[in-house]
Amino acid sequence: GILEIATSLVKKMPDNKLGNQLPNRPRSWRVLMHHLFQIPVAFLNMEDTGETLTYEELVAPPPEDMVTSAAIAEFGDQVRERFNAWAYRTNGEDFSGEVPTYFGGTTRHEMLERTVWHSTQHIRQVGSLLEQAEVEVEKLIGSEDIQGLPLTNEIWDQA
């Protein structure tokens, strides 16, 4: 799935690139790669506690000791396992009810969908960064993979 692709891409990022800054955004490559896994963490925490999904949790920075691509990928593997366990546990549940978020109420289904496409966009960005770093990757998420999602063909925000 998406998180598996993310982990495989993150593992390939050279550690000496993690401090580089993203185009048109004051965010390091390290922070972006952590963030793409923090998005489902925030969703899962909301699911587990019933508390409001906050912006602060969504953009929480990586721990200071998470300084290698391998460490970020390990975090990603843990998130993937937690997400898969949640998906198994909630299979067949009603997702039409409202859940509390920092941007107002939305349905559980819409929040899950938003979590998936938000992470997907950042995975596309990591793929682009790997290309900039001249790292070969077998498969990137392309335009054909995102059809039907509320994403543009643009990978980066414009200045």
PLM features per residue range, with description:
Residues 10-15, 90-91:
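Short secondary-structure junctions
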Residues 7, 16-62, 97-159:
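Short, contiguous alpha-helical
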Residues 64, 85-99:
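Catalytic cores of extracellular degradative/oxidative enzymes
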Residues 6, 79-83, 126:
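Hydrophobic alpha-helical packing residues
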Residues 83-86, 147:
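Amphipathic terminal alpha-helices
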Residues 64-79:
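A short, structured beta-strand-centered segment in the mid-to-C-terminal lobe
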